A protein has these predicted regions:
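Chalcogenol-based redox active-site neighborhoods
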Residues: 1-160
Length: 160
């Protein structure tokens, strides 16, 4: 079943590079007690993700904070080392938490996994964005395959 407005974010452990090492991030603690703009994408260093999706959230950091967002997070089915390197490449440090869902457990629990095997990428996350307030989904925007519009930072700003 796909996550929907009013659902609680599933409990899972993601990974984030901290002090040069992968560190576990509990979704319960990360999303608890704060408003989070969450977005996910099929893969680090892929064209749309690198040219539009991540830069949009990095560039909208101040606007999102001004609208009450406490944290911005990007999730992808990649390992923490790749997500950390990509975050540096995208100048996301200090603005967007680059969270690795290495085994896809969180993505699967959300019901937002898709099979990208025909591209040599295995199981990946669909492209989406959410507003999560104290662990509860307030808005969810899932893109059609190949599309990029409702998961953008610009769209999230209209929902706050």
């Amino acid at each position: 079943m796909t996550i929907k407005v009013g659902d609680k974010i599933p409990s899972a452990t993601l990974m984030e590079m901290q002090d040069g090492k992968p560190a576990p991030v509990s979704t319960d603690s990360f999303f608890g007690g704060k408003k989070v703009a969450l977005f996910a994408l099929p893969g680090a260093f892929t064209p749309t993700c690198s040219a539009k999706h991540v830069p949009g959230f990095v560039n909208s950091y101040d606007a999102l904070k001004a609208k009450g967002v406490d944290a911005i997070a990007c999730v992808s089915v990649n390992d923490a080392f790749v997500m950390g390197a990509w975050g540096k490449d995208q100048k996301a440090d200090g603005k967007v938490h680059m969270l690795a869902d290495g085994n896809g457990d969180f993505t699967r629990a959300l019901g937002l996994e898709f099979d990208a095997s025909k591209f040599g990428m295995g199981k990946r996350s669909q492209r989406y964005s959410m507003i999560v307030d104290n662990g509860v989904v307030k808005e969810v925007n899932v893109e059609e395959p190949g599309a990029f519009s409702v998961s953008s930072a610009e769209h999230i700003l209209t929902e706050l």
